[in-house]
Amino acid sequence: MSRKILVTSALPYANGAIHLGHLVEYIQTDIWVRFQKMSGNECWYVCADDTHGTPIMLRAEKEGITPEQLIARVHGEHSRDFAGFHVGFDNYYSTHSDETRDCANDIYLKLRAAGLIETRTIEQYYDPVKQLFLPDRFIKGECPKCGAKDQYGDNCESCGAAYAPTDLKEPYSAISGAKPELRTSEHYFFKLSDPRCEAFLRQYTSRDNGVLQNEAANKMQEWLGAPGENKLTDWDISRDAPYFGFEIPDAPGKYFYVWLDAPIGYMGSFKNLCARNGLDFNEYFKPDAKTELYHFIGKDILYFHALFWPAELAHAGFRTPTKIFAHGFLTVDGAKMSKSRGTFITAESFLKTGLNPEWLRYYYAAKLSATMEDIDLSLDDFVARVNSDLVGKYVNIASRSAGFITKRFNGQLAPATAELPAIKGIQEAASRIAELYEAREFGKAMREIMALTDAANQYVDSVKPWELAKQEGKEVELHAACTNALNLFRLLTVLLKPILPIVAEKVEKFLNIAPLHWADTQSLLAGGHAINAYEHLMTRVDPKLIEKLVEANKESLAPAPEAQSQQRHAEHQQNEVTAESPWEPFCNIDDFMKVDLRIVRIANAEHVEGADKLVRLTLDVGNNETRNVFAGIKAAYDPAQLIGRLTVMVANLAPRKMKFGLSEGMVLAASDGEGKTPGIFLLSPDSGAQPGMRVK
């Protein structure tokens, strides 16, 4: 029975070019979608540009154009690049659309009606020149820990320290250079910490539920905490004007944070497709839908897609994703993509250099699995593998046999030898390879297909049509040998069609056949079938083209300030390598042991009146002793939810007199210095730890 499937890829941010890191996901998704369609399933593939946010607004202003003009131009560039790599979206849309706005408003109003939206007053830095509130990455100053200048508002790239923007010394706006002012503003929060959300997410993200890969499910349980320990924090879903995005209903001057409406862009894009194609939107998004919904994403945006997004959908009365498939990042020659080395390669430059996009599609397929492991693009291996597998093995079968059919047999085939072991081998393996495609184990599928290709070539080598053609009286044998070779080639083309759609089209034209489907692996071309003249299908990779590509992508390592501020976006690209190491210099064990790390229990936690970031913690450090500590975690944790929790503190840090009192230590928390994963995460020891125990 045919399945009804809706598939999405993450939305690329409309503030930069598509590069080879992005293409891992879109090629992976496209292969899976093409396989589903070949298998007879009704499968729709939608995506869109992620178009909202402060960086879009500022870049448009810098270019002297409107945000609408900027996103329209970038949409054209992205569409061109995806088409160049044969990514076959059924709809590639924009989040800046009426459909997405309507869906965002609908979800928000339903969450509000369910009591899952609340307002809070927060304190933020404000740029008096640009007259806007500044995101953390748009504030710079001196690091409060090491004194390094020109550091961002959330972490120091010199010493790695994480802090609140208000901790910066001599802060200034990265946009105007002005000294920012602290101002209060009312913000809107989605109550992810609500017991209803927690209970739903514990079940939804569990390994037993099967929505996530095991490693992703394990990560979700870390973020949720142990049963009875709700580590979820409420999510700030609003931003203040001026902001390029959708205004929140009944809240003039307040806008949805871009990450609120970005995944809703999946719905908006599909709604647009439904209107054009006469599809039923509700059939795919009603809570009891029998259809299937799959999201392909990078592992760095799991937090949004596996926690916020399904919680929003479930409590707004929509279905949740059937499965969420997360993949790893791309490295090039074993390292992060780097502009200085020329390995931060854009899709446009790859195509302009003259490289065949199907070479990359095949190489990625050969490396991809169903896990979240990173994959490496080794440029030397890329050349060797494509030349060996695609040209030397696969295409070689047709090039060694087709010409004889055209020249000697008027383009007509003989009856195929159905019991030929190489033919039977492909037909018997087809269902197994289909299972690998379904499971996204593309690398395993490619290995099986290449083994079958080797067997096909062994058959051609054994019958030697080029020698039969020289011998008188061998016409029947030659005709049969070339017919069998072309039938083998056709069967292999079916198996490779999700990877090589353009080559498959050329093969269909050359063999004079209808578009191939997966079921065609079980049939052969009939005797007397007429084929067309063979035309060359694929050339070898010239290593000089790779050298040209690398040179074309080399540029200064110094990123533009605007590019540095894009850390939070939905685009799951790897950031280029910087000259600084992300690790601290080595210390010896004696230096480490000078830091007295202790397990503590949070005996009490309360807001600090007049402080926008601080929570006052009373810590039980064991031996009936308590310490008073101020922690900059207000944006991440409700103080009431911290009481009773175990964490880790630096017990021998010199007391520090603050405006609000004396701080007698420091609790430890983690944050993503690159901004890919938002939030602050208080450290927790394993079960069994007791206050006063030393960490060593």
Swiss-Prot record:
| Biological processes per GO annotation | methionyl-tRNA aminoacylation
Q: Where is the tRNA-binding domain?
A: 591-696
Database matches in InterPro entries: aa-tRNA-synth_I_CS, Anticodon_Met, Met-tRNA-synth_bsu_C, Met-tRNA_ligase_1, Met-tRNA_synth, Methionyl/Leucyl_tRNA_Synth, MetRS_core, MetRS_Zn
Catalyzed chemical reaction(s) = tRNA(Met) + L-methionine + ATP = L-methionyl-tRNA(Met) + AMP + diphosphate
Which residue numbers does the motif 'HIGH' region cover?
Answer: 12-22
Which annotated residues bind Zn(2+)?
C143, C146, C156, C159
- Tell me the keywords, alphabetical order: Aminoacyl-tRNA synthetase, ATP-binding, Cytoplasm, Ligase, Metal-binding, Nucleotide-binding, Protein biosynthesis, RNA-binding, tRNA-binding, Zinc
Q: Would the keyword Magnesium be found if you checked this record's keyword annotation? A: no
Localization recorded for this chain is:
Cytoplasm
State a GO cellular component annotated for this protein: cytosol
SUPFAM superfamilies noted in UniProt: Anticodon-binding domain of a subclass of class I aminoacyl-tRNA synthetases, Methionyl-tRNA synthetase (MetRS), Zn-domain, Nucleic acid-binding proteins, Nucleotidylyl transferase
Q: What are the names of the required cofactors? A: Zn(2+)
Q: Name one GO molecular function term.
A: ATP binding
Cofactor note (record): Binds 1 zinc ion per subunit.
- Domain of life per record: Bacteria
Q: Where is this region: Disordered?
A: 556-580
Q: What is its main location?
A: cytoplasm
Name the Gene3D superfamilies for this protein.
HUPs, Isoleucyl-tRNA Synthetase, Domain 1, Methionyl-tRNA synthetase, Zn-domain, Nucleic acid-binding proteins
Subunit details for this protein? Homodimer.
The Swiss-Prot or TrEMBL record describes its family as follows: Belongs to the class-I aminoacyl-tRNA synthetase family. MetG type 1 subfamily.
Name this polypeptide is given: Methionine--tRNA ligase
